[in-house]
């Protein structure tokens, strides 16, 4: 084969691999955003119910615990994951 078609095929394969990697990252980030929205909605419902009734709903707290969300101190300046 001539060198130009070989280079074109290699470039096409590399472009496809890069596209797969980029779209994989996009899908992962999109899932994170959806999960965070769900967590935010649950927290908002908890706050709303706590204001209405004076206590928190156990069902929604257990849903947050199942998702791995820690309740408590939420200080953005207090980062311990370094």
From Swiss-Prot:
Topology, Extracellular side: 1-7
Domain of life: Viruses
Residue spans, topological domain Cytoplasmic: 29-82
More info: HIV-1 lineages are divided in three main groups, M (for Major), O (for Outlier), and N (for New, or Non-M, Non-O). The vast majority of strains found worldwide belong to the group M. Group O seems to be endemic to and largely confined to Cameroon and neighboring countries in West Central Africa, where these viruses represent a small minority of HIV-1 strains. The group N is represented by a limited number of isolates from Cameroonian persons. The group M is further subdivided in 9 clades or subtypes (A to D, F to H, J and K).
Annotated HAMAP family: HIV_VPU
Description of activity control: Ion channel activity is inhibited by hexamethylene amiloride in vitro.
Cellular compartments annotated: Host membrane
Subunit and interaction comment: Homopentamer. Interacts with host CD4 and BRTC; these interactions induce proteasomal degradation of CD4. Interacts (via transmembrane region) with host BST2 (via transmembrane region); this interaction leads to the degradation of host BST2. Interacts with host FBXW11. Interacts with host AP1M1; this interaction plays a role in the mistrafficking and subsequent degradation of host BST2. Interacts with host RANBP2; this interaction allows Vpu to down-regulate host BLM sumoylation.
GO molecular function annotations of the record: CD4 receptor binding; monoatomic cation channel activity
Keyword annotations: AIDS, Apoptosis, Host membrane, Host-virus interaction, Inhibition of host innate immune response by virus, Inhibition of host tetherin by virus, Ion channel, Ion transport, Membrane, Phosphoprotein, Transmembrane, Transmembrane helix, Transport, Viral immunoevasion
Family statement drawn from the similarity comment of this UniProt entry: Belongs to the HIV-1 VPU protein family.
Residues with the Phosphoserine modification: 53, 57
Chain's gene name: vpu
Entry domain remark: The N-terminus and transmembrane domains are required for self-oligomerization and proper virion budding, whereas the cytoplasmic domain is required for CD4 degradation. The cytoplasmic domain is composed of 2 amphipathic alpha helix that form a U-shape.
InterPro entries: Vpu (IPR008187), Vpu_cyt_dom_sf (IPR009032)
Record field: transmembrane: 8-28
Location (main, coarse): host cell
Post-translational modification note: Phosphorylated by host CK2. This phosphorylation is necessary for interaction with human BTRC and degradation of CD4.
Record-level GO cellular component terms: host cell membrane; membrane
Keyword Phosphoprotein found: yes
Coiled coil regions, renumbered to chain: none
GO biological process: receptor catabolic process; symbiont-mediated suppression of host innate immune response; symbiont-mediated suppression of host type I interferon-mediated signaling pathway; symbiont-mediated-mediated suppression of host tetherin activity; viral release from host cell
Job description of the protein: Enhances virion budding by targeting host CD4 and Tetherin/BST2 to proteasome degradation. Degradation of CD4 prevents any unwanted premature interactions between viral Env and its host receptor CD4 in the endoplasmic reticulum. Degradation of antiretroviral protein Tetherin/BST2 is important for virion budding, as BST2 tethers new viral particles to the host cell membrane. Mechanistically, Vpu bridges either CD4 or BST2 to BTRC, a substrate recognition subunit of the Skp1/Cullin/F-box protein E3 ubiquitin ligase, induces their ubiquitination and subsequent proteasomal degradation.
Organism: Human immunodeficiency virus type 1 group M subtype B (isolate HXB2) (HIV-1)
Protein name listed in UniProt: Protein Vpu
């Amino acid at each position: 084969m001539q060198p130009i078609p070989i280079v074109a095929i290699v470039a096409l394969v590399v472009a496809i691999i890069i596209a797969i990697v980029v779209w994989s990252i996009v899908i992962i980030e999109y899932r994170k955003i959806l999960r965070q929205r769900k967590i935010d909605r649950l927290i908002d419902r908890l706050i709303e119910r706590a204001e209405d009734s004076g206590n928190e709903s156990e069902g929604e707290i257990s849903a947050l615990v199942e998702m791995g969300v820690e309740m408590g101190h939420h200080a953005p300046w207090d980062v311990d994951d370094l």
